[in-house]
Amino acid sequence: MKQFMDKDFLLSTDMAKTLYHQYAETMPVLDYHCHINPQEIYEDRKFDNITQVWLGSDHYKWRQMRTNGVDEKYVTGDGSDREKFQAWAETMPKLIGNPLYHWSHLELRRYFGYDGYLNGDTAEEVWNLCNAKLQEDSMTVRGLIKQSGVTLICTTDDPVDTLEWHQKIAADDTFDVQVLPAWRPDKAMNVEKPTFAPYIAQLSQVSGIAVTDLASLKDALKNRMEYFAANGCSVSDHALEYVMYAPASDEEVDAILKKGLKGEAISKEEELKYKTAFMLFVAKQYAKMNWVMQIHYGCKRDNKAYMFEKLGADTGYDCINNYAPSAQMADFLNELSATGDIPKTILYSLNPNDNASIASIIGCFQGDVPGKIQQGSAWWFNDHKLGMIEQMSELANLGCLGNFVGMLTDSRSFLSYTRHEYFRRILCELFGSWVENGEYPADMKALESMVRGISYNNAVKYFGFKLDEVK
């Protein structure tokens, strides 16, 4: 029996161990998509206790605590931090097979030097150990980032954001990790929502362009894209129910936009036409600006209405949406391709059943650069051992896995960089099994190049960041 989470955790073959320990383990971290707060990086926040850093905004953990019958008081309510930590600790032993069990223990080992395991009985010991460690100068937000080997972070930012914290970080020569904005214009696209008109008023104010029709909306968006680009942005992200394709004339889209600006009801057909036009417009701009377009789709959000009213979005009440017409995605990419306006694109589906369709679709639109159209890393509900293996295996079956840009945290926590380690171990185990089974030769030069590439170097080249590859 192997020891729990030893140095060869998740590595079962000699080749897997060689690939991980010689090539993947020491690679830096490029976190090209996350939800951390740049203000906390600039201000170099120091956390008072482990609950603040672990449970403050982690809806993955909240969801499992609720599943374990924990009262909301000890999840997001007014329970004390110590009580919330106890509730989480008592939940942990039941999470066998869940990536949270692995991630949490990796974080305890890497950042706090704790080699035991967390449960209700050890909670006091872990609480005291972690809280004492958090008072050390190396355990501030910047310290955690630096000791994690991070070279660059892309946050997630709205077009109306000032980007002041990114600017302050860039001007601070005491911190050499790049923290760049990423453009997330969902609020400008959600014409069917009651928040649309007030948001467009904000966009008008920030851009200095009064948005009254489709032409002025495009001008305002271009204005803000240029502002983001001037502040280092070269990455966008979109959260879609699915990748739709409902083409319409400019006149139709203009009329729909004007209805939205008046707060009038928008039909489903009108919503899809507006969103299609919006996505086609911004995608063409991304191609001109050499930005990468990320699309996350397949999520049905905020399913528990009264808790959404109480807590807001991203609080643990989302699920997989199994409606994703792949033909429309292909049609959307085809229109961009037909005019030479297809940007580098990364597609992520929350539904694991979409792996094969994505892998097959992206093969239709490649060109210019290696892996121009990517299948994104296993995301959210798929961000576990089996999900990662299935995503990479399907991409290998139907595409060119060696060009894959690899892992991202997609996290709100500064301890989540261990997810890159988790991913790399699974990657090396997968490659190792293929070599051990005689399905790929023990060509160490090729294997080293691919492992280093998927761990870090491919993303450096793909996104065009000002970073050096690691050989």
Segments and roles (model prediction):
Residues F332-A338:
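Short, basic/hydrophobic alpha-helical segments
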Residues Y323-M329:
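Divalent-cation-assisted or electrostatically stabilized phosphate/pyrophosphate-binding catalytic cores
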Residues K2-M289, D341-P343, L347-P352, A356-A359, ...:
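Metal-cofactor-binding active-site regions of metalloenzymes
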Residues F308-G316:
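Short glycine/proline- and charge-enriched loop/turn segments
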Residues E270, T315-C319:
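Metal/cofactor-centered catalytic core regions of large enzymes
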Residues K304:
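Hard-cation-handling environments
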Residues M293-I295:
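C-terminal amphipathic alpha-helical interaction region
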